């Protein structure tokens, strides 16, 4: 049942989805109506996000979880970095996928979130995060310099550009 999403796709929010016999509600109980992907993000529409996750399916959804490094250490230059907590793909039910689509059940660190989001909007390049670019002595000598390390590509430049537009709309028109 999985397929790719298209920017022309529309999603009908009637206020909820029923998944495995369980009603999962949108914050807008009377529904948002027919929404584009951009409008669904602007409205933070859980119903549309659940439909999007169902469209791409569990395998593709979890491929993106992995691409964005959720559930893995980022390599940030801080002691005690945590992995976060992600349900293993083979244990995920349709209900889990539905609620994961709007961020529930995904326990990620702030560093993971920032690194992932940065790659989403910077053209799709996931870089190892650092807190400090360089350290210089009082005399101006460079004592430490952290180079940018490209870890992987997460999305295409075209997808990144599209999402930048959608996210601008979230700021301009969203909830």
Predicted regions, residues:
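Beta-lactam-recognizing serine transpeptidase/beta-lactamase-like catalytic domain environment
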Residues: 4, 8-175
């Amino acid at each position: 049942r999985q397929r790719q999403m298209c920017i022309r796709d529309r999603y009908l929010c009637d206020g909820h989805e029923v998944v495995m016999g369980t009603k999962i509600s949108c914050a807008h109980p009377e529904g948002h109506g027919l929404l584009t992907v951009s409008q669904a993000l602007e409205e933070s529409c859980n119903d549309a996000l659940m439909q999007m996750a169902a469209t791409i399916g569990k395998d593709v959804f979890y491929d993106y979880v992995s691409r964005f490094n959720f559930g893995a250490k980022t390599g940030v230059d801080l002691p005690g970095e945590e992995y976060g907590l992600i349900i293993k793909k083979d244990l995920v039910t349709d209900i889990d996928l539905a609620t994961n689509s709007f961020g529930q059940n995904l326990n990620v660190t702030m560093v993971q979130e920032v690194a992932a989001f940065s790659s989403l909007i910077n053209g799709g390049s996931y870089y190892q995060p650092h807190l400090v670019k360089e350290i210089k002595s009082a005399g101006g000598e460079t004592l430490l310099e952290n180079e940018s390390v490209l870890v992987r590509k997460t999305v295409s430049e075209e997808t990144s550009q599209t999402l930048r537009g959608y996210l601008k709309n979230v700021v301009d028109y969203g909830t």
